[in-house]
């Protein structure tokens, strides 16, 4: 009999009673669940939590494609998304699927984080992002998903033909992903400092203190709809309380 697992079965219902509205429609609910899932694995004692965070630090700073994507998948899970790394030919590097109540979204990500001779985003990079968006539209749009496509990179410029063909594709700066993680790490640490595996009141208190610091559902889509080619940390984190 696993007491922590049994306790986890009831705590979500307790969170829904925190407010008078239906909390399951709120992004907050999904963050709480993701934070709880992680802390139930890592606990509040010892150094497992710090080691987990430090590993994610290294992955998101990595210049190696697969290592970065490993961290990016873990980050997506931690903020309430279902990250998917498709295996089929010409697959996107990573796709985040978010289902938050009646709101559904898909974001595809192409990671261009390794150094290239050009030192700039080239037309084929943008072409890949367009292809992944077209594939996501064909698969998910009729199911009611809002769909966006992006490229994550350390590069700060596009070749002229890449810029002219980019359309609605957004370029997310790699450092903004690290800044997003640093924000999440701070919130997660504050949450963990109050949270307890066995105390429902402590869980309730940690959830209550977290809620006003979070953005509303759809924050990532709104960031990607910002009228600029490059999505910097100021744009990506604009709805997160600093």
Listing of model-derived features with the role each one plays in the protein:
Residues 48-223:
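Catalytic core segments in nucleotide and nucleic-acid processing enzymes
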Residues 2-63, 230-242:
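Interdomain/boundary linker segments immediately adjacent to catalytic/signaling cores
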Residues 211-242:
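Charge-rich interaction segments
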Residues 1-2, 10, 146, 151:
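Compositionally biased, intrinsically disordered low-complexity regions
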